[in-house]
Amino acid sequence: MTKQRTLSIIKPDAVEKNVIGEIYSRFEKAGLRIIAAKMKHLSKAEAEGFYAVHKDRPFFSALVEFMISGPVIIQVLEGENAIAKNRELMGATNPKEAKAGTIRADFADSIDANAVHGSDAEDTAAQEIRYFFSDTEIFG
């Protein structure tokens, strides 16, 4: 077992639905510690920078517009196999394909408004965490 850190974002649709506490409870019940957190309304430049890896994909503009449509909650999760554990909690990107009981199955409306983001690998987790948090903002 490897202790890892991963970035998680509760997206504007889930913030609007007021399910932040329910999502945090799932993280904690799965053994993930929230070691940094902030609420932020992303600027267009911040959203474009964060999702730059997708800039040539057809959904990029819609994704950026969605991510700046309201506030998000950004957190760093820490725990054993945190990346895989968080991805399991989130469920499939498309909530229609997500297993019952996952965050996306329970709280997401569509593949676009899919409630949460989570890092997919250790290198991207480290990069994504650095994008939003300085070392002095992380307590773990």
From Swiss-Prot:
Pfam families for this protein: NDK
Cellular component annotations (GO), alphabetically ordered: cytoplasm
Domain of life, source organism: Bacteria
GO molecular function: ATP binding; metal ion binding; nucleoside diphosphate kinase activity
Compartments, as annotated in UniProt: Cytoplasm
Keywords: ATP-binding, Cytoplasm, Kinase, Magnesium, Metal-binding, Nucleotide metabolism, Nucleotide-binding, Phosphoprotein, Transferase
Co-factor(s): Mg(2+)
EC numbers on record: 2.7.4.6
CDD domains assigned to the protein according to its UniProt record, in alphabetical order: NDPk_I
InterPro entries: NDK-like_dom, NDK-like_dom_sf, Nucleoside_diP_kinase, Nucleoside_diP_kinase_AS
GO biological process terms held by the UniProt record: CTP biosynthetic process; GTP biosynthetic process; UTP biosynthetic process
Chemical reaction(s) catalysed: a 2'-deoxyribonucleoside 5'-diphosphate + ATP = a 2'-deoxyribonucleoside 5'-triphosphate + ADP; a ribonucleoside 5'-diphosphate + ATP = a ribonucleoside 5'-triphosphate + ADP
Oligomeric form and interacting partners: Homotetramer.
Family listed: Belongs to the NDK family.
Protein name (database record): Nucleoside diphosphate kinase
Source organism per UniProt: Francisella tularensis subsp. mediasiatica (strain FSC147)
